[in-house]
Amino acid sequence: MSEETTKERKRPRQRTRASKNGEAFKKLRVIVLCHEDLVPPDTIEGLSAKEVAPFKTEWDVISTLKKMGHEVSPVGVYNNLGVIGNALIEQKPHIAFNLLEEFHGYPLYDQHVVSYLELMKQPYTGCNPRGLTICRDKALAKMVLAYHRIHIPAFAVFHMNRKVKRSKRLKFPLLVKSISEEG
């Protein structure tokens, strides 16, 4: 990093104010990363619950952070990390609140957004890239849990386009799930 870049990344000291219990807390600059279609409007006044439903989580997070006195900027992301990079440069956030569940339409790519935040040395909320990778692979997650003697239901992995032979240790009723899809 050049000297000029280092100077740009220095953050000014923030004002503090008292919380309800009298403790002081720091006013933070927060960027909220969310899908570009889910960036909520400035107000939901006059909108029905059905209209608010798609971006309810984003609205709740942003409005709560603002009510707590933080400076909040939503950042809509679809397939361009440059949008996040620009927000980091322009907003100089203390933290990124990560609400992204996918990148470029792929849920498996959300871990790469978090990796980018780590490369940029940007503090963020949520799980680190390794944790996201493990959690996205149900079989791997179950193997890690079993290794640590955490009880889990019996499972088996069946590969696509291959004949399925049920293991005797699997008893009916059975649930069939994709190894990498949510749900």
Label the predicted regions.
Residues 2-29, 40:
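Hydrophobic targeting/anchoring helices
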Residues 27-34, 89-90, 134-183:
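Active-site nucleotide/adenylate-binding loops and adjacent lid/helix of ATP-dependent enzymes
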Residues 39-57:
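Glycine- and acidic-residue-enriched helix-capping/strand-helix junction motifs
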Residues 43-48, 92-136, 151-154:
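A short, GP-enriched loop/loop-strand-helix hinge that lies immediately N-terminal to
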Residues 65-73:
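A generic structural motif
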Residues 73-92, 107:
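Glycine-rich, highly charged phosphate/nucleotide-binding loops
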Residues 74-76, 126, 157:
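A structural preference for short, hydrophobic beta-strand core positions in alpha/beta folds
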